[in-house]
Amino acid sequence: MESKYKEILLLTGLDNITDEELDRFKFFLSDEFNIATGKLHTANRIQVATLMIQNAGAVSAVMKTIRIFQKLNYMLLAKRLQEEKEKVDKQYKSVTKPKPLSQAEMSPAASAAIRNDVAKQRAAPKVSPHVKPEQKQMVAQQESIREGFQKRCLPVMVLKAKKPFTFETQEGKQEMFHATVATEKEFFFVKVFNTLLKDKFIPKRIIIIARYYRHSGFLEVNSASRVLDAESDQKVNVPLNIIRKAGETPKINTLQTQPLGTIVNGLFVVQKVTEKKKNILFDLSDNTGKMEVLGVRNEDTMKCKEGDKVRLTFFTLSKNGEKLQLTSGVHSTIKVIKAKKKT
């Protein structure tokens, strides 16, 4: 499947820009890919694609190319490349998509097996502090988790879970809910597409997630996933700084330094509301800067006025021309919090 990503990187991406546009594209590669400028100076399109893939892998190379195209305002090309990537993503999912759980897999014995796997993971030998830096780096690379379907069990602490809501798909209406979980090292936003699991996602509860998808910035739990209560002796000691970071609203000047595609949750003050035919545009601000939000126009968002606050969940950092923008997606939610009336 990686060959498909290589193909669209070259044929849909780099082959469709002019020599002058390629030079501008190369300007950003040394930072995005950590490629020496000397190697890029005389490189043709095939050589550029090869360097990118060697440095970051085919999938990451495509995603970063989309971001650079957006940064350069090659919006049509960015859109085409994104569409082709999504087609390949769907093909990959259809190949790797796990089958629904059988009765045997849902049995207590299967649950016990998952817990045994977790116990083995916890008992795995750790890297000695006396290991050389080069060896530590190799171990870290071996242990790094790739995006996609994950069989490995993940013990986490639930930090937050929101109410289920309905969203539209080509197959009709479906239900899901958002959650936030954390390990001892990091936190994750989670899309949960099985609302029967809502009683598992209780704040401060330790659970084990298996057969889930890992994406850039979030986890996906669906009907084929397993979510179990951890054993009473299983602990996930989440540091306070991770808990705090998971729940805080990012500052706008921080968002302006993040890569396109970053998932954003938070509470923001509205400075201006502009209604469009199908969408609604909010100008947000905090004490560090300003940013636009493009949301779906509905009864709730149309009630929003200057001075109100909006709580955004699963919005995506994107670009509209030269402006950074937070954009609503199929699984995004927005809640309007009216400002208190002055007495």
From Swiss-Prot:
Taxonomic source organism: Homo sapiens
Result after altering K162A: Impairs DNA binding. Impairs DNA binding
PTM comment: Degraded via selective autophagy following interaction with TRIM11.
Free-text activity regulation comment from the record: Inactive in absence of double-stranded DNA (dsDNA). Homooligomerizes upon binding to dsDNA, dsDNA serving as an oligomerization platform. AIM2 requires large dsDNA to generate a structural template that couples dsDNA ligand-binding and homooligomerization. Homooligomerization is followed by recruitment of PYCARD/ASC to initiate speck formation (nucleation). AIM2 and PYCARD/ASC homooligomer filaments assemble bidirectionally and the recognition between AIM2 and PYCARD/ASC oligomers occurs in a head-to-tail manner.
GO CC annotations, alphabetized: AIM2 inflammasome complex; cytoplasm; cytosol; mitochondrion; nucleoplasm; site of double-strand break
PROSITE patterns in UniProt: DAPIN (PS50824), HIN_200 (PS50834)
Tissue expression summary: Expressed in spleen, small intestine, peripheral blood leukocytes, and testis.
Sequence ranges assigned to domain Pyrin in this UniProt record: 1-87
Mutation effect (F27 to W/Y): Impaired ability to homooligomerize
Molecular function as annotated in GO: cysteine-type endopeptidase activator activity; double-stranded DNA binding; identical protein binding; pattern recognition receptor activity; signaling adaptor activity
Localization per record: Cytoplasm; Inflammasome; Nucleus
Function: Sensor component of the AIM2 inflammasome, which mediates inflammasome activation in response to the presence of double-stranded DNA (dsDNA) in the cytosol, leading to subsequent pyroptosis. Inflammasomes are supramolecular complexes that assemble in the cytosol in response to pathogens and other damage-associated signals and play critical roles in innate immunity and inflammation. Acts as a recognition receptor (PRR): specifically recognizes and binds dsDNA in the cytosol, and mediates the formation of the inflammasome polymeric complex composed of AIM2, CASP1 and PYCARD/ASC. Also acts as a tumor suppressor independently of its role in inflammatory response. Able to suppress overt cell proliferation in enterocytes: restricts stem cell proliferation in the intestinal mucosa in an inflammasome-independent manner, contributing to a decrease in the likelihood of colorectal cancer development. AIM2 suppresses cell proliferation by inhibiting phosphorylation of AKT1 at 'Ser-473', preventing AKT1 activation and AKT-mTOR signaling pathway.
Segments crossing the lipid bilayer: none
Outcome (variant: K309A): Impairs DNA binding. Impairs DNA binding
Effect of L14A: Fails to activate interleukin-1 beta production
Induction: By IFNG/IFN-gamma and IFNB1/IFN-beta.
Example of a GO biological process term: neuron cellular homeostasis
UniProt-recorded name of the protein: Interferon-inducible protein AIM2
Keywords: Cytoplasm, DNA damage, DNA-binding, Immunity, Inflammasome, Inflammatory response, Innate immunity, Nucleus, Tumor suppressor
Pfam families (UniProt xref): HIN, PYRIN
CDD domains: Pyrin
Signal peptide residue numbers: none
Impact noted for substituting A36 to R/D: Impaired homooligomerization
Gene assigned in the entry: AIM2
Record text on subunit structure and interactions: Self-associates; forms homooligomers in response to cytosolic double-stranded DNA (dsDNA) and the dsDNA seems to serve as oligomerization platform. Component of AIM2 inflammasome, which consists of a signal sensor component (AIM2), an adapter (PYCARD/ASC), which recruits an effector pro-inflammatory caspase (CASP1). Interacts (via pyrin domain) with PYCARD/ASC (via pyrin domain); interaction is direct. Component of the AIM2 PANoptosome complex, a multiprotein complex that drives inflammatory cell death (PANoptosis). Interacts with PYDC5; disrupts assembly of the AIM2 inflammasome complex.
